[in-house]
Regions:
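Extramembrane terminal tails and long inter-domain/linker segments of multi-pass membrane proteins
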Residues: 1-29, 42-47, 123-124, 334-413
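Long, contiguous internal "core" modules enriched in hydrophobic/ aromatic residues
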Residues: 5-11, 22-28, 82-84, 122, ...
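C-terminal hydrophobic structural anchor segments
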Residues: 284-287, 292-364
Length: 413
């Protein structure tokens, strides 16, 4: 069969320069917000001694989880041998690197003392999942970069499958580690669950594929390159499966917690009387982020509409952000149960639901991390041969390991 031709985009249009300028401005604003919080102190944020992980952590965890899932498209093509996905492998790998870089940038800038990161990188407490995650995150970046090299270098193509298998296993471990950050926190009743690790893996598949779909559709629309309905339908059906899987894990998580009397308090808080957290859970996470996308993706007519597919992917991302917000911030807002069966009160807000309102600098820092991920992808498709010249239904291209011919780029972007 004819090999796939990969070409850089021209990147000479006004729209492309406007996109780069917008993303660059968001990054600059995010850096400014980080500087403001660093020099003014975290009292200018909505975070307190009760809620120490705020909105930046929501963005960071979302990007890190989505990074693992974004690589899933490459894994399906090279590791599991599904030919239609192979031309997408390069973009999948770059998006995974970009999302993880954006998430880690938010984390580092939100630490308060990012210069102290050197301590965490030189002195390890291997009883802490945070110490393990340093290796998992940096290892992921290195392995995926090598994986991308194997795919793009013709003489190294034969190694792409074994390296892809290593990347596949590594990303499962990485997402397990991210979920275990919360699963191992036994003091927080909203976190303490072994189900966190597999649920985060399912979340990564859903969030990552949703992000990949939006990037893919935007890239081919902006460059006027053919993108066939057949491939989009494959991807949207896969997204529907992942969304349903996440919904299943969420249901099992809450049902198992409701079975144990000790968790009735925190479950009642999240599901019934948690105010904004309850609203985010039912309206944004469940209705808008799960049920509505499933309806749009599997509707006989709407499911074939590109607008519906893009809307569904955007809703999945919105629901994912709400899910992580409820998990991270709602889990901290519910008071610690220090003495089970007893009522606790003190001047240190023991036994009181903590209040939290996202501040503008926190949101801007999070958006800066998202912009950083997107600008890496935008520059990547201009500098490297990541995008196939055609993904049309009639295209016989199926081999992602092929070198492009080096002809001038197609018009667009």
């Amino acid at each position: 069969m004819k090999k796939t031709e990969f070409l850089e985009i021209d990147g000479a249009s006004g729209g492309y320069y406007a996109l780069i300028a917008l993303l660059g401005a968001l990054i600059a604003i995010g850096l400014g917000a980080a500087y403001y919080m660093e020099h003014s102190g975290h009292h200018v944020t909505g975070m307190t001694n009760q809620i120490v992980w705020g909105t930046p952590h929501v963005f960071a965890v979302f990007l890190i989880v989505a990074a693992s899932g974004a690589l899933n498209v490459a894994s399906i093509g090279s590791v599991f041998g599904k030919t239609p996905y192979k031309p997408l492998s390069r973009l999948s790998a770059v998006l995974a690197i970009a999302l993880l870089a954006g998430g880690l940038a938010i984390l580092v800038l939100d630490l308060g003392r990012p210069d102290r990161l050197i301590v965490a990188m030189t002195y390890y407490n291997f009883k802490s999942i945070f110490a393990w995650n340093i290796f998992l995150y940096t290892g992921f970046l290195v392995i995926v970069a090598v994986y991308l090299w194997m795919m793009m270098e013709r003489r190294m193509n034969r190694y792409s499958r074994p390296v892809g298998l290593v990347a596949f296993i590594w990303r499962l471990i990485l997402t397990t580690g991210t979920g275990s950050i919360f699963g191992f926190l036994v003091a927080r009743q909203a976190y303490d669950a072994a189900l966190m690790a597999p649920m985060f893996i399912a979340m990564s598949f859903s969030f990552g594929l949703a992000a990949f779909l939006l990037v893919l559709m935007a890239s081919y629309r902006g460059t006027a390159r053919p993108l066939g309905d057949e491939l989009l339908i494959r991807l949207k059906n896969l997204l529907g499966v992942f969304v349903a899987t996440v919904l299943y894990f969420v249901m099992v998580y809450h049902l198992t917690n409701l079975y144990g009397t000790e968790h009735h308090g925190v479950q009642g808080f999240i599901l019934l009387d948690g105010g904004i957290y309850t609203q985010l859970f039912w309206i944004v996470q469940i209705l808008l982020g799960s049920l509505l996308p499933l309806f749009l993706l599997y509707h006989p007519r709407l499911g074939r509409s590109r607008a519906s597919i893009a809307t569904s992917a955007a809703l999945v991302i919105l629901g994912g952000l709400a899910q992580i917000y409820v998990l991270i911030i709602g889990g901290q807002a519910y008071p610690l149960v220090m003495f089970p069966g007893k009522e606790v009160s003190s001047s240190f807000f023991d036994g009181v639901v903590a209040s939290y309102s996202p501040s503008l600098p926190e949101v801007l820092l999070g958006l800066g991390g998202v912009a950083m991920a997107l600008i890496i992808v935008a520059l990547g498709i201009k500098i490297l041969r990541l995008l196939p010249l055609s993904l049309g239904d009639a295209s016989p291209s199926t081999d992602s390991g092929a070198e492009s011919s080096g002809e001038p780029s197609a018009a667009g972007a």
